[in-house]
Amino acid sequence: MLIAAGIVVVALAAVGAALGVALSGGSSKANLPARGSLVDALPGAPDVQRELEGIPQRGNVLGSPSAPVTLVEYVDLQCPYCRQFETEALPELLTRYVRPGKLEVEARIVAFIGPDSERGRAAAIAAARQSKLFNFTQLLYFNQGVENTGWLDDDMVTSAAASIPGLDVPRLLSDRSSATTDEQASAFDSQANADGVTETPTILVGKSGATPRQVTLASPDDVQSVAAAIQAALG
């Protein structure tokens, strides 16, 4: 059973207005590094680095820009089922389809569950401006806490940013509260509304440039159904 948006009673249209969360608040982490590295990194950071190394990223898209098939994923950073998909299914899809240039993955991050989702989304969008969105989100999934317990606070955001080699940490923290970040968050919500997204993860697959179709997942780590949709799109 996947997480339904209605359970959380967060209307997509109201998400942008609900940014009362302190997205731009300073972190209490001492000795903030200028650049991220694997020194004193969060658990899972080396694994994420190996998993994504060499795969091109641009904004919220992972994979070759000439890939013939696109997978669109709607995810919430607090969603435990999204964590299953991202840490169990996605790595296999990266190996089979993304690295060979057959598939690109477009992440559209929603915030159905609560304030931590909002805070994490803003930071992920800021990471996307440095082409590190997938590094950031994968690392958060590796270190995911219990929903709405405050686990995704400024310290977690800062620690995650500091665990991504090469990422400009102060820039990410500053970019979280920019107008560009707010606009992208609103765009994700509008896209989710248009695609009728009511639960996470929601996965759509189709030929690049065409309208993708939703894939019904038997379980959050259902690689087989997603792979079948990719193969069909590849022809």
Could you say what each language-model-derived stretch is?
Residues 1-112, 189, 228-235:
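Extracytoplasmic thiol/disulfide redox context detector
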Residues 59, 111, 124, 145, ...:
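Conserved short-loop catalytic and cofactor-binding motifs
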